[in-house]
Amino acid sequence: MNTNQSKFPLLAVGLSLSLWAACSTNHEHGAGVSAENGQGAYATGHYRNLFVEAGHPPQEVQARVEACFNQLFHGNPTNQAVYYEAGSNSNGPLAYITDIKHHDVRTEGLSYGMIIAAEMNKKAEFDALWNWSNTYLYHAATNDPGYGFFAWQARTNGARMSQSIAPDGEQYYVMALYFAAGRWGNGQGLYNYKAQADELLHRMIHRGLITGAGGRGGSQTWGPLFDVTNKMALFTPAIDRNPLFTDPSYHLPAFYELWSRWGPAEDHDYWAAAAQASRDLFAKVVSPVTGLNPYLANFDGSPYRGRGGTNFSYDAFRTAGNWSVDWSWWGKDVRERAMSDHLQAFFESKGMTNYGDQYTLDGRQLEGRHAQGLVAVNAETSLAATDPGRSKEFVEALWDTPVPDGLERYYEGLLYLMGLLHCSGEFRIWAPH
């Protein structure tokens, strides 16, 4: 969960080549094109490298990704890094990723950092982030309304700022853990990655209602992270919030397809249906003219009229990356191609180097900041878009954008690094052992 409100990513080229060679040989190979498997990377084993397609040498692309990781994870702590080591405990080293601007730690950033680490074969960083998450954020008490999930926000010393849950974090934790099991195998306890993923995934849809002290005080009742009937991620699992609603950027059909194969067997059909429900929601919430989607939505696809939810703002620009990666991995829903085309046409019309990052759905600009994270996500839409010339413009815009630093480097930087991984074909599927 990210908002600008109170509640609200360079080693020697030789080493980089070794890493990327491993990436090209150890991910899950193509399962074969079929109606069930789709026609994307899961079926074919082929991940497009949009930078190479645009004419950049593979070695330069590889070096760029590694340099970005090094800056954000191990750069100058004053104005470059978002990853910070934090001692150790009985489970090993601890580390967190912090939102520099808001002086806090969020499950969003921790889970993003873990999936980046899994993709880039950085086991030490992965384990340290997972250890910190469990040490400080995990709701362990069985009478806690948040039991089995993670408090979404804390200070850098681990003191919780909120007990509430933001389901985007749990979803990325699960996917990162499955990929870790595929890359490195499973260890013991906290580092039995697949067992941890299975348990959390099961709770996301099956955990019962628990009433107790939670959130901002008082007695609250929280349940599972998904609306089980609509098969959609909730903005928050507090069931006494009426009506319940969703955040389109929490919808990750590319992940749900994998969970329908790798997760607990009794839930395979559920996750397959959830993938389709998310694709259908995208088609409802996205403007057919601008390609923009609201920050928050009701389950029927209408914008949620609260918390600024009717506008393209805050979390909203992550959504296009979700549907574009879904097309890249699965290739099941051609509507995603049209949505990417509409979005690219809109932002191109606003000027490739100066479009803003907040709009009404009909295209009136609300905020003029040219966000580096949005540049990255818009480049990802080239994975699904159909106009080669225009798609290349968006890829080149990301290539020409420097690694975020300074005050905004948390959200912009993590989205930027994930954008580099997606556009270089190195954000891949790693089947768990």
Can you say where each PLM-predicted feature lies in the sequence?
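Bacterial N-terminal signal peptides that target proteins for export
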Residues: 2-11
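Bacterial N-terminal signal peptides
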Residues: 12-20
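Bacterial Sec-dependent N-terminal signal peptides
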Residues: 19-37
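Extended ligand-binding clefts on enzyme/binding-domain cores
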Residues: 33-74, 78-81, 103-107, 142-148, ...
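Aromatic-rich carbohydrate-recognition surfaces in CAZymes
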Residues: 103-110, 158-185
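Alpha-helical support elements that line or immediately flank enzyme active sites
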Residues: 111-123, 133
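Solenoid-repeat scaffolds in large eukaryotic assemblies
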Residues: 113, 125-126, 190, 197, ...
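Solenoid-like repeat scaffolds
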Residues: 397-407
